[in-house]
Amino acid sequence: MIRLAPHEVLVGDSAAVAAALTRWRTDLTTLTGAHKEHRFRTLADHLDEWRSQGVDTSPFHSGLYLARNRYSEIGLRHMLPLDRVLVGASSTRPGAFGGFHHPNQGYRHLQMAALITMYGPLDRDVPADPDLAMLDLVRAHAHDCLHYGSARRYVLGENGQVVRTQYGINWRRPDGRTYSSSDPQDAAHTRNLGIIMEGACDRESRRLTRQVAELYDITGPDSPDDIGWWAYRDATGQLDDDEPAADAGKPFDGEAGTYAGSMARYQRSVNHRYEQWLAEVGAGEREGLQDLVLTAVISGDTGNLCRRLDDRHGPGTFAGMFRTSGYLTAPPQQTAACV
C-alpha cells in the first residue's frame, strides 16, 4: 500500500501514480548510493544506540516536542517518521565529516525519506560532541519535517514517470517549465520560490534549535578556531550577515574545511537572501510574513499570502515578483512529419 506524506495529492490516474511512487518508496537503501563509505541506520535505531552508549538524547526529543506543537499551528500535524530518516556514521572514508551541510543529503520527496549524517567526525558510531550533534539533529529533522509536510501534486508524465507539478507555493508545467526562475549566482536578494521555501523552513528549524540550546544550556565551543563554534551559531540561527566568510573553510583541514565552505555558501545563497526578502517585503511584520509563507507551503494555498502582499504592495505582487514570463505561454507547436 502506498505511503503518502500528509499533503500529497495524486492527480489523473491516481492508481498508476501510486504504483510508480510505491516503487520509489519501498527500498530506502537506494538513497545511500552516493555514500557507500558510510553506514546508515534509521534515526530511531541511532537514538537507541547512542542512549545505550551514555549519550543524552533528550535535547532531540525536546526539539521534536517543540516542533510538533509549533507545526500544528501552521497546519502540519504529522511529523516525518523516525523510520523514514537514515543517519550515516561509522564511515570508512578517512577524515569524513558529517552534519547538516554534508553533501548529497536532505529530504527526498519521491522516496518520502530523509538522508542525513551525524555531526562531526564520521569515523565512529557515537558523536564526538554529543551536544552539538543533538542540536544539528534537531535542526535537520525539524527542517525535513517541513519538507515532508509541504503540499505536493503528482501526475504521471507521458513517459510513465512521476512528475511533481506543485511543491508548496511553486509550480511546474508537465513540460518542465517552472513558475519561478533561478536567481543570478551573485544575487544578494531572491525572486526564486525555491529559495523562499527553503529559507522559511530553515529559519523555523533554526529557531526551534535555538530554543533547545537555551533549554539545555548548550553554548558550543568558545573559539572560532573550532569549527564547532561556527556550527553552533549556524544551527541556532545566530550568524551575522557577513558570516561565515566565503573562505571560511581555509582554517580547517580536510572535510571539516569543506563543511565550513558549504555552510558559508548556504548562508549566503539561502538564509541571507530570504532574510533580505523578509526585510524588503515584510518590513515591521517579518514574523507574520514568515508564518504566512510556512502556512502556504504546507497547505499549497497561496490565498492569504497573496492577499497580504497585495494589501501591502499592490495587486498582483506575488505573480509580479516570482512568475517567469514564459510560464503560461502556449507550448511550441509540433510540426507534423511528412509521410
Model-derived features with residue positions:
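Residue-level detector of alpha-helical secondary structure
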Residues: 18-25, 29, 44-51, 278, ...
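Short linear interaction motifs
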Residues: 113, 119-130, 176-187
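Post-HExxH zinc-binding segment in Zn-dependent metallohydrolases
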Residues: 165-247
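Pan-zinc metallopeptidase signature
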Residues: 225-339
